[in-house]
Amino acid sequence: MKRLYLVRHAQSEYNEKGIFQGRLDSDLTPLGFVQARLLAREFLKKKVDIIYSSPQRRAYKTALTISDMLGTQLVVDERLREMSFGEYEGKHFWSMLEAHKDVFLNWLSNPVKHPLPTQESMEEFEKRVRSFLEDVKSSHYQNMLIVAHGGTLHAIVCLLTGIGLENLWNIHMDNAGITEIHMEGEKSTLVYLNKLCHTRQLT
């Protein structure tokens, strides 16, 4: 059995400001660095054979903090980048929702049927995420930690559990949230979603 730990990056500067990020590359906030250290402490309790990270700073610095504390190999994989939102990147989410309400509500309800006009195509997005998952399935590692972004990690959950990318935004993961999936052959089981108990001291 393979055990996958999916971790959404710690809080970034654009998260704090409510800005749509996608491929933009904002750094962690001071709170984000604290969250990353709390994640690292949490994973000291678990067996982790390898860490995979998106190359984007908010994910990479989260992963690097964990890797440094665990002494575990960190591998950067381009396929874990966040999906591109085109011309919507760098804009405030709520102002866009107000200006383009129907477009955004349709996209949130079913991004396959109603993609954003300028985003990375769902076909391209699915192809790169599936490519990564095929490598995960064939890997000799049994306990893998994957640090990436909301859209990318939601896609991994959708594809492994078979619920389809039309449910991409029906999943919620907070900054520094942990999700665990077990893989046995072609069967995947969602053990828990968006675990946050390691960050309780921040509330």
Curated annotation (Swiss-Prot):
The record marks R58 as: Important for activity. Activity is not inhibited by EDTA in vitro, nor enhanced by the addition of Mg(2+). Its EC number is 3.1.3.3. GO terms for molecular function: L-phosphoserine phosphatase activity. SMART domains: PGAM. It catalyses: O-phospho-L-serine + H2O = L-serine + phosphate; O-phospho-D-serine + H2O = D-serine + phosphate. Pathway: Amino-acid biosynthesis; L-serine biosynthesis; L-serine from 3-phospho-D-glycerate: step 3/3. Coiled coil: none annotated. Keywords: Amino-acid biosynthesis, Hydrolase, Serine biosynthesis. One of its GO terms (cellular component) is cytoplasm. It comes from the Bacteria. Pfam families: His_Phos_1. Gene3D superfamilies: Phosphoglycerate mutase-like. InterPro entries: His_Pase_superF_clade-1, His_PPase_superfam, PGM_Phosphatase. It is an enzyme of class 3 (hydrolase). GO terms for biological process: L-serine biosynthetic process. Belongs to the histidine phosphatase superfamily. Metal-independent phosphoserine phosphatase family. Part of a complex that catalyzes the dephosphorylation of L-phosphoserine to serine and inorganic phosphate. Is poorly or not active toward D-phosphoserine, DL-phosphothreonine, 3-phosphoglycerate, para-nitrophenylphosphate, and fructose-6-phosphate. Does not display phosphoglycerate mutase activity. Heterodimer with PspA. The PspB subunit appears to have no or considerably lower PSP activity compared with that of PspA. This is Putative phosphoserine phosphatase 2. The gene is pspB.
